[in-house]
Amino acid sequence: MPPTALPPLRPPAQPYDSYSSSLSPSSPRFHPASAPHGRRAPSPSRLESLLDAPHAPARSPSRKIRSALSRHIRPHLTPRTLTPLLLWTLALWLVHHFLFPFSSPLAALSRPKAEQHFLSTTFPPPPQRLGDDRLDSVDPRWRAFHPLPPPEPPFPRLRPTRFLPPQCLEQWFADGETLCGAKEMGEEETLDATWLWVNGSDHRWRDSMAEWREKENVNSPERHFREQNELVHSMRSVLDALPGHLRTFHLILADYPFNYPEDLDLVPPSIIPDLEVAASKGGQGRRHPRELARAPASVSNLTERLTPESISPSLARHLQSEWRILQTPTWLDFSRRDPSDPSHPFHPYSVSKAGEMRQHYAEASYPTLRYASHWEVFHIPSVDRDGREELMGEREWRENEWKKKALPSFNSMAIESRIGWLPGLADAIIALNDDFFLLRPHAVSDFHSPLYGSVIRFEHSYNQQVKPDVEKNHINDPGEMGGLYHANALLSRRFPHRLRPYFAHVPKVITRGLHHEASLMFQEALTLSSTRKFREMKIGEGDVQMQWLLTSLRVERWREALLWTWVVANMGTLSGSHDRWDSDTRSAIKHLFGFTEDDDDVVKIEVHRGERWTLEPGRMQKVFHQAGWEAPKATEFLFSSMDGIMPPLLRSGEDPSQNDRCIIDLNRCFGVFWTRQEDVLSADMMKRLTFQYPECGDCMIMALVTASGTLGLNAFFPPKETTITAPELGPGDAYPKYLPPPHLPLTPTWHEADYSLSNILSTTALPGEQVDIRQYCMRLLSRYLYLDAKSVSHFHMMKSAEHAKRVFKMIQDNPKVSILGMNDDIESDYDEVKRLMNEWFEMRWPRKAVWERDWDPVKDRYHD
């Protein structure tokens, strides 16, 4: 039985162009009679003769009409006739607004839409730092900088994923293919890339680590922090593999307090006048960095070495309290990080000034390089899971106290858990270690696309799966096992308690939106684990392997959203009640499984996986070509979320065909709804199928995917034009300034989650809005799309010089290897291994990045 649907709203009339004039046919003030078509305008002499001619005695038709109206209507415009008319209008208004309110077509057209309250899918760029941040560092080892302020509260604000246009979204999710082309789909995504880096030979860093090791009574391996010059070549490899498809590179770097006066030498003398103004006015005298060139020279000689006597006491206090010192790679020239700067070699101004006629596409779309210190990314949410903002004083006090415990950090897992707070980060990100390298050309779609989602590279060995419980002997594990177990324990409290696959040692694809969801969902555990300065500390339940948590969270959120779409949004709205399963739902389930009148005694149903064409050879390439996007180049795809959920991993020797069938026990899966024919709340059935009896939910997904045919997921969705009215504002609630995108509860456990439509729409739709629930579900699912894939990748633990030679020969002899990971586990021949590594790096990626100090404007340019 189809659900009741409100009639669709008519599209609003197109407003006229406010810039049109009476001479434009599109203008409401245009008079055709004033400019007869095809008649030439009279000459000036003709105009003069017309003006001088006597007026014609005949009256115009319009004047006759006005005269007749005045003669017949004016006698009736008296108080005796107007008063009843006004009273009748007032009475109608009172009845309409207070007694029997009814919807008006004009009101419906002017009603605000949720889309008008969504934030942009693009995260805003960060503000400029105080001082000229485009200057190079005075000392290549360290950089004096003014940290960016914390994100504006409330933070994090969930932003929508890049949705396909509505007509493309409907075709894609319902039919598994789309007629939309490049014009409708828009430009291809670009990617951001992130790296963590530390120089373990820096004496300031070593002294700090030694001090905190003694305080915390821990001993961490030195090899975790050794520098082999990997970072610069890892960045070169990404530039070579994805030319023209990268937006921003992000470096996350260690930092220290500003020691005055020792660190005064690290402040560029040219910015002192501007800093004096800022310090004297409490920071209110800031100017844009480009104005520094016009700043007055308030010091005697800006090229001389700064001394405490050459700056004011207020500036000295300002530097001590607000500035910090950044540890930097010595090869990094900070003046060539931003292609939007006219002085950048790849800026169009510089290119034209050099007399070049055309620019290589890789240089025309060259990425920006941003840096962020640990101080700038270590923040905690300023909102709760329901979007309520904390009081300002309480928030600042809490964060400051937490930072005292968390920083400085020597724990890469703690730092990685803050990646989503990077200023100016895009939504789609490749997260790399500095010892990860791309060896072959890649497309953006090898990592992410709006059509198929993020690409995950799982390990498919049953014995490598991650356990779902915290083990006490791994809480202070110097490796990653403790962080993996803790991450799966968190997931198993929120989702089904189960083993989950490990992932390959390759760059990870994460989205900032999902990172923000995790930061809210598991905020207590992540806030505590981030205070573990070393992995060996015994705080809480251990580290959290954030990249693995985000990868597995995507898989679980997709499954949860699929089941919610069918259980709550589809089956729960069949009878128009919007919140329960009833007799109409039972009829729909019987129809799904092909029941007849003689099948009332059926208790169990065997479901078989149907044939699917989503990943058939050539289909994906055709879809990307149609969209005008580049198809994957270096990836083999094993599973698409557009085919449901990933089958579980099997032990060695088990029959793979068992993953192609399952049994639905109707009594066990549906409980009293089936055994006693009782109505139940759809939100309760959601928990039963998704979490209490997860095998029931998994089997229902297989049945619905099969019912959808060879492509698409049409069987999950409610019928077209099914609309649900969002709840009105509650007493004391404020009208939302912005709306988060469609998403399900962010509670840390499933028991406390409320999956009812009214609760979900109360935070993701406008009060009283008529929500197209079918499109809503498709947008919800867009957020969590994924592909399981594999690439030809190698991961090696460097042991000795002889081992390094064998590794490099093996890679050179196999051109199919697309991703390489190399871990420093050197036991002997350290200097020789380091020499071999750097020789091979330079042989493999000789072209320097533009931000390297010894970049050559001739030798290191791109050529067709």
From Swiss-Prot:
Q: Which residues are glycosylated?
A: 199, 301
EC number, as in UniProt? 2.7.8.32
User: Lumenal face: residue ranges?
Assistant: 103-864
Q: Which cofactor does it need?
A: Mn(2+)
Q: Where is the signal peptide?
A: none
Enumerate the InterPro entries for this protein: Stealth (IPR047141), Stealth_CR3 (IPR031357), Stealth_CR4 (IPR031356)
Q: Which residues cross the membrane?
A: 82-102
GO MF terms here are: glycosyltransferase activity; UDP-N-acetylglucosamine-lysosomal-enzyme N-acetylglucosaminephosphotransferase activity
**Annotated region (Disordered), positions in chain:** 1-47
- Mark out the compositionally biased spans (Pro residues): 1-14
Q: How does it sit in the membrane?
A: Single-pass type I membrane protein
Q: Which domain of life is it from?
A: Eukaryota
For this protein, what reaction is catalysed? Answer: 3-alpha-D-mannopyranosyl-alpha-D-mannopyranose + UDP-alpha-D-xylose = 3-O-(6-O-alpha-D-xylosylphospho-alpha-D-mannopyranosyl)-alpha-D-mannopyranose + UMP + H(+)
Provide Cytoplasmic-side residue ranges.
1-81
Q: What is this enzyme's class at the first EC digit? A: transferase
An example Gene Ontology biological process: D-xylose metabolic process
Q: Which UniProt keywords apply?
A: Carbohydrate metabolism, Glycoprotein, Glycosyltransferase, Golgi apparatus, Manganese, Membrane, Transferase, Transmembrane, Transmembrane helix, Xylose metabolism
Q: Where is the composition biased (Low complexity)?
A: 15-28
What family does the database annotate?
A: Belongs to the XPT1 family.
Q: What does this protein do?
A: Xylosylphosphotransferase that is specific for UDP-xylose as a donor and mannose as an acceptor to form a xylose-alpha-1-phosphate-6-mannose linkage. Functions in the O-glycosylation of proteins en route through the secretory pathway.
- Protein name, entry field: 3-O-alpha-D-mannopyranosyl-alpha-D-mannopyranose xylosylphosphotransferase
